[in-house]
């Protein structure tokens, strides 16, 4: 059928299941309007997990990612996904509160600075060593590896810094 099917077959031949990505681009109400169709599409096409993204200022009112309005949305999306037996890995979502114990289909939240921050802000070398003892107390974490070029000036000539890491 399509290129996605080619990738799914290749992954399946190696014992790997594909995860669908739903990037909302911060248009949360629009995403909510389409959740049933999106989740049904996933079920119909053999996807049982989704990584949902919320990059940007939340539309329509500029809500905060960690505010009550968005917390209500995250819970709504996780409950709706449970109805379809879909696992959720929420990216740019709120820090975990323990709802993964009530909704075990919530398999992870990012809610931590991954190495994608190295490109523009940098993380301290010890940052990732602290996460299991700080961030992961609240629940499972999605850590985004994001950057593999350690010399930032190769991506941005004005940035002469190097990724602070033990990777040479």
Regions found by a protein language model. Give the residues of each.
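Short, small-residue-biased leader/transition segments that mark boundaries at the very start
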Residues: 2-7
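Alpha-helical scaffolding segments of alpha/beta enzyme cores, especially the outer helices
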Residues: 9-13, 37-41, 72-83
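Alpha-helix capping and helix-loop boundary segments enriched in small/acidic/polar residues
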Residues: 12, 25-33, 61-72, 78
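Short, acidic/polar
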Residues: 30-44
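Short, hinge-like loop/turn segments at secondary-structure boundaries
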Residues: 37-38, 68-69, 105-109
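Glycan-recognition surfaces
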Residues: 86-168
């Amino acid at each position: 059928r399509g290129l996605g099917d080619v990738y799914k077959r290749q992954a399946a031949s190696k014992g790997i299941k594909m995860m669908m990505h739903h990037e909302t681009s911060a248009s949360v109400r629009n995403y909510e309007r389409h959740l049933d169709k999106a989740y049904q599409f996933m079920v119909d096409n053999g996807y049982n997990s989704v990584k949902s993204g919320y990059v940007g200022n939340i539309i329509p009112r500029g809500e905060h990612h960690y505010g009550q309005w968005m917390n209500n949305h995250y819970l709504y999306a996780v409950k709706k996904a449970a109805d379809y037996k879909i696992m959720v890995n929420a990216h740019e979502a709120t820090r975990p509160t323990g709802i993964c114990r009530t909704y075990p289909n919530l398999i992870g939240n990012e809610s931590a600075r991954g190495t994608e921050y190295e490109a523009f802000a940098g993380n301290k070398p010890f940052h990732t060593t602290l996460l299991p003892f700080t961030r992961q107390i609240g629940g499972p974490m999605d850590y985004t590896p994001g950057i593999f070029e350690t010399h930032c000036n190769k991506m941005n000539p004005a940035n002469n810094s190097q990724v602070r890491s033990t990777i040479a």
